[in-house]
A protein has these predicted regions:
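Asp-based, Mg2+/Mn2+-dependent phosphohydrolase catalytic module
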Residues: 1-5, 39, 96-99, 113, ...
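Catalytic-core regions built around general acid/base machinery
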Residues: 90-102
């Protein structure tokens, strides 16, 4: 077993914070304004990149229409949605424990960089992380795979001693594509089918340190 403490890379939505209320409220308002009827359960849009669900919601729309829909959503999220959010129970304690042990901690999210930074600042979590990676494009063009690859490369992390911790299949697939292990955050928004594809499953934030140590 390596004596190097693993670097731990956390997803944001559904892993560190419960962002569903703010996301779904803004989605509901924007879809009403666009007269998009019966979109189905909105919670399925928590986690995937905005650009992915604009295609689903506007299957016959133009790229310009999808960009405008994304902009309208983000305008609502910028005004009010980002604050309609909370830190999951046990996450602060988990981060404090991992930091005390000495694990380097990072955030990698498909959310736009400035939103991620604002949310972490709101909850006074920024100081716990070495770096925060989100998308910087207005209409995001980077996949979670690419964002994670950039983080690993720019911080000279070794895939053998790095974990991705997230709640959705996008986190698991990004970890697999970058040849790092993934710990599923079982308290988040993912399904049992998604969690089954991870290397390990943490039922609560309190389980993370022990699972990483035992790996």
């Amino acid at each position: 077993m390596s004596s190097v403490l693993p670097a731990l890379i956390f997803d944001l939505d559904g892993t560190l914070t419960d962002s569903e209320p703010g996301i779904t409220d803004c989605l509901r308002k924007v879809l009403d304004a666009w007269r998009i009827n019966d979109p189905g359960p909105l919670d399925r849009f928590v986690g995937p990149p905005v650009e992915e669900w604009t295609v689903e919601l506007l299957p016959d729309g133009s790229q310009d229409d999808r960009i405008r829909l994304a902009r309208d959503y983000r305008a609502c999220y910028d005004r009010e949605g980002w604050k309609n959010n909370s830190v999951f129970a046990g996450v602060r304690e988990m981060l404090a424990e991992l930091g005390k042990i000495g694990h380097p901690l990072y955030v990698c999210t498909s959310k736009q960089q400035h939103f991620a930074a604002r949310i972490l600042d709101l909850f006074q979590l920024t100081c716990l992380f070495t770096a925060i990676y989100g998308d910087k494009a207005e209409y995001a063009s980077h996949s979670k795979v690419d964002l994670l690859a950039n983080l690993v490369r720019e911080n000279s992390l070794s895939p053998e001693t790095t974990w991705m911790i997230g709640d959705r299949i996008y986190d698991i697939q990004a970890a697999q594509a970058n040849q790092i292990r993934c710990l599923a955050a079982g308290w988040g928004y993912g399904s049992a089918g998604e969690f089954a594809q991870a290397d390990a499953l943490a039922g609560t934030p309190a389980d993370v340190a022990a699972l990483v140590r035992a790996a």
